[in-house]
Amino acid sequence: MTEIRSFYDEVGGRPTFEKLVAEFYRGVAGDPVLKPMYPEEDLGPAALRLQLFLEQYWGGPGTYSEERGHPRLRLRHQPFTVNPDARDRWLAHMRTAVDSLELPPLAEETLWDYLQRAAFAMVNTFDD
C-alpha cells in the first residue's frame, strides 16, 4: 500500500515553511505600506502565526487551529486597509520568498497559485 504524503511533507515540512516565512518577513520589515499593519514591534509573532497557518493549510500539524481557532482570514484582516497596492506589495515579497525555496516546478506553481488567490481575496478596499 502506498503512503499518501501531504504537500507539506512533499516540499520539506517545517524547514521549508520556516524559510518561506522568514524570507517573506525580511521584505515586509522594510516595507512602508505593509510594516504598519503589524501591531507588534517585533514581526516574530506575526511570522509564527503565518508559518503555523501555512503548515496547517498544506497538511502539516494543526497547531494554528489549536492555538487560534478557525483561521477566519478575511475577518482577521478586516481592520487593516488591504487595497491593491498592499496586495501587490505582499505578493512581491512573497514571490521573493517562494523563489528562495527553489521548489520543483509543480510544487512552486501549486503554492504560488494559492498565495495569489489568498492575496486577492484579502483586498477589502480600493481606496488608498
Q: Where does each model-flagged region fall?
A:
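Heme-based O2/NO sensor domains and their adjacent alpha-helical segments
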Residues: 2-5, 18-99, 105, 112, ...
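Internal, conserved structured core segments that host functional sites
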Residues: 114-117
